[in-house]
Amino acid sequence: MKSHRYIRRKILCITVVLLAVSQRTAPASKDENSRTESHQRAEVILLYQRNSGGWPKNYEREEKLSKKARSKVLSEKNKNDAMIDNGATHTEIRLLADAYHETSDNRFRDAAIKGITYLLAAQYDNGGWPQRFPEPRGYAKHITFNDNAMIGAMSLLRDILVDHKRFPFVSRDVRAQCGKAIESGISCILKCQIKVNGRRTVWCAQHDEKTFQPRKARSYELPSFSGSESVKIIRFLMQIDQPGKQVIEAIDGAVTWFDHSKLEGIKQVRVEDPTKAGGHDKIIVKDDNASPMWARFYDIKTNDPFFC
């Protein structure tokens, strides 16, 4: 009997130990994994933040950096490559705000505030944003709608202004600055809108920072009506509460242009082409049943679509 009781006690002890170990080594839940990934991503974002407060574009936010790679990134803190192109800076600020909400790590909060300060400082007095700041050169100094740059920055500032739950750490004074920046940005948008015979149409991907006229960027980004960036601009304007007469006219003019400029009876298809990068190309073919589509660029003088 004594032997049996001893065995039962040993089994009970082993069971308790195994249970404890299994609890410690159990797979993390989906929420825990998500929080861990968010935290790791925020750490990478901290590394890449420039001393100006902004971020460069196209680095890998999910990257797991070696010691050598971390040292290299840290050595580039003074690099003048911070910008708002391709989602840079305004995306990082959102991710840092989320990471701070999950972890209460003040480093994420402080970096987000520094990024917001960067965006406010980067805005021109006329309300526009250059693609790159500080000391923008070449086409990077133009007022940049290309790839959602200016609208991405303005959308973030608008969210900071109204979403106190996501951005509780932003002071009342900074929120007020965000509000003024948005108003100034809207004024700039209206000044940039291209007029033809006195009628409002749409926007170019980039505009002159002094005259507001359409401007060229890269070789294939010519002064033109943009069938892409203009969509994002209109959506932003449509979200304005109680818009003024000028904003309503801007939206109506742009919508009319889109209606007149739609392309019917054609569609874009992907074809194999080993001579092209990725082994494929895109071509336009006739199709009477195709849904309407719009070109990325339209000639300002003729309103004809063109391909570069």
What are these regions (language model features)?
Residues K2-L12:
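Bacterial N-terminal signal peptides that target proteins for export
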Residues R109, I113-I116, L120, R137, ...:
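Eukaryote-skewed repeat-based solenoidal scaffolds used as protein-protein interaction platforms
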Residues W55, K195, R199, T256-C308:
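CBM-like carbohydrate-recognition segments
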Residues K30-S34, L74-T89, R137-M150, K216-E229, ...:
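Solvent-exposed loop and edge beta-strand segments that line ligand/cofactor-binding
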Residues S29-N33, R41, L46, H90-D105, ...:
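Well-ordered alpha-helical scaffold segments within catalytic/enzyme domains
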Residues V16-R24:
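Hydrophobic h-region of N-terminal signal peptides that target proteins for export
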Residues Q40-G53, A111-G128, G179-G198, A250-K267:
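Long, well-ordered core segments of solenoidal/helical folds
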Residues P27-K79, V196:
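Low-complexity, Ser/Thr/Pro/Gly-enriched N-terminal "stalk/linker" regions
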